[in-house]
Swiss-Prot record:
Residues 1-85 form the YcgL domain. Signal peptide: none annotated. SUPFAM superfamilies: YcgL-like. This is YcgL domain-containing protein SG1337. InterPro entries: YcgL-like_sf (IPR038068), YcgL_dom (IPR027354).
Amino acid sequence: MFCVIYRSSKQDQTYLFVERREDFYRVPADLMAHFGKPLFSMILPLDGSKKLASADTGKVKELFKEQGFYLQVPPPVESLLAQHQRAEKNLIIDPCILASE
């Protein structure tokens, strides 16, 4: 079994996996409209000989059987506030600097 991977023309880091090239008949029309024009990326075997970058091969196979495609979306972006708060917690203040003030 192979998967054909397309990247989205509208959504950054979003990929659509289908079983055959140009075979989008099982992908819902709303999803295709949101995805934009599929831009061919590559064809990979799903036999375990090659590892998928961000997807589990077993999950891709399972969803091919259930719905005929697999959609890979980017991980959620951490808010800038959360990044700032985490950085503040990890901030180490040199006591020598405080003593000189």
